[in-house]
């Protein structure tokens, strides 16, 4: 039984195994209707719980479709239904769910909730997102880079904006997949030192550059994310926009990167805030391939978790 809690907690060879599996499964589905089962149906007879304390579109749809394509069934549970940690303990919830399902995916706010779920579950647990990390997204991003440009090892990845949970998982991936990483954003939104330190300990070049044009110079991949959350009050939104406006990914900034550089955004996006529509719909952008690859990467993760 394998939990998938964070990229840095998984062996590099096993990450490579998952990545190769994701590429193979995507290729095998070429031309097939979306609702058609995979030929081998590895999840036939299996039940997967999808827990959403924090709501999502891409995570819910991609996991649900992925389980069904592999022949399994899903049970989707919202935060209101679960009341995690309010009443029944997370530990007891994990033990009970383990009697009903074969695999648990949880998208939650606090990392502690994920870790407690994994500690007490007797079935594999997948991190669908926490406020600290988002490993499933980064597996999809690495997959997307590989299918467009080949190995990501030795490449320069630049993150522009807020050093959030997706940025943190990129730093974990830098250490595991062997690419260099530059962050450009305001000092108040730097990624946590723990994540920067991990990548550096793995021998990767990690830099923080306040000038976005200098940061993006020679980049192979430029990545950004939303500046605000749907839950942020208006005052916080205005403050963050003022902080982050200099780090918008626009055509002028992308012109500083390599001519064949890619642009990624995990979506949903606030168009013409963190990135302009000209970039999102332009020749560097692979954002919709990136979104699709959530499906294939997560299918590979589920197979690995179950030893299939």
UniProtKB/Swiss-Prot annotation:
The keyword Cytoplasm applies. It is found in: Cytoplasm. It catalyses: carbamoyl phosphate + L-ornithine = L-citrulline + phosphate + H(+). L-ornithine binds at residues 165, 225, 229-230. Its main location: cytoplasm. One of its GO terms (biological process) is citrulline biosynthetic process. InterPro entries: Asp/Orn_carbamoyltranf_P-bd, Asp/Orn_carbamoylTrfase, Asp/Orn_carbamoylTrfase_sf, Asp_carbamoyltransf_Asp/Orn-bd, Orn/put_carbamltrans, OTCase_ArgI. GO terms for cellular component: cytoplasm. It is an enzyme of class 2 (transferase). One of its GO terms (molecular function) is ornithine carbamoyltransferase activity. The keyword Cytoplasm applies. Pfam families: OTCace, OTCace_N. Pathway: Amino-acid degradation; L-arginine degradation via ADI pathway; carbamoyl phosphate from L-arginine: step 2/2. Carbamoyl phosphate binds at residues 56-59, 83, 107, 134-137, 266-267, 294. It comes from the Bacteria. Its EC number is 2.1.3.3. Keywords: Arginine metabolism, Cytoplasm, Transferase. Reversibly catalyzes the transfer of the carbamoyl group from carbamoyl phosphate (CP) to the N(epsilon) atom of ornithine (ORN) to produce L-citrulline. Belongs to the aspartate/ornithine carbamoyltransferase superfamily. OTCase family. This is Ornithine carbamoyltransferase. It comes from Cereibacter sphaeroides (strain KD131 / KCTC 12085). The gene is arcB.
């Amino acid at each position: 039984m394998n939990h998938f809690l964070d990229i840095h907690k998984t062996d590099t060879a096993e990450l490579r195994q998952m990545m190769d599996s994701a590429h193979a499964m995507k290729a095998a589905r070429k031309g097939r209707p979306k609702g058609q089962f995979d030929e081998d149906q590895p999840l036939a007879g299996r039940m997967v719980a999808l827990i959403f304390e924090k709501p999502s579109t891409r995570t819910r749809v991609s996991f649900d479709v992925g389980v069904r394509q592999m022949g399994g069934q899903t049970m989707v549970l919202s935060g209101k239904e679960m009341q995690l940690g309010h009443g029944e303990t997370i530990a007891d919830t994990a033990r009970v769910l383990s009697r009903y399902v074969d695999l648990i995916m949880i998208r939650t706010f606090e990392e502690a909730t994920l870790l407690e779920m994994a500690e007490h579950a007797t079935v594999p647990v997948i991190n669908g997102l926490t406020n600290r990390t988002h490993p499933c997204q980064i597996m999809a991003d690495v997959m997307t880079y590989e299918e467009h440009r080949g190995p990501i090892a030795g490449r320069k990845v630049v993150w522009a904006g807020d050093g959030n949970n997706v940025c943190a998982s990129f730093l974990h991936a830098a250490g595991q997949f062997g690419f260099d990483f530059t962050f450009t954003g305001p000092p108040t939104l730097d990624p946590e030192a723990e994540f920067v330190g991990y990548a550096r300990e793995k021998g990767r070049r990690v830099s923080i550059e306040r000038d976005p044009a200098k940061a993006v110079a020679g980049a192979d991949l430029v990545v950004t994310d939303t500046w605000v959350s749907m839950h942020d009050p208006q005052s916080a939104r205005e403050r963050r926009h003022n902080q982050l406006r200099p780090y918008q990914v626009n055509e002028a900034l992308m012109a500083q990167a390599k001519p064949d550089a890619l642009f990624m955004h995990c979506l949903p996006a606030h168009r013409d805030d963190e990135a302009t529509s000209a970039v999102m719909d332009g020749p560097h952008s692979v954002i919709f391939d990136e979104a699709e690859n959530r499906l294939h990467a997560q299918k590979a993760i589920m197979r690995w978790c179950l030893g299939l």
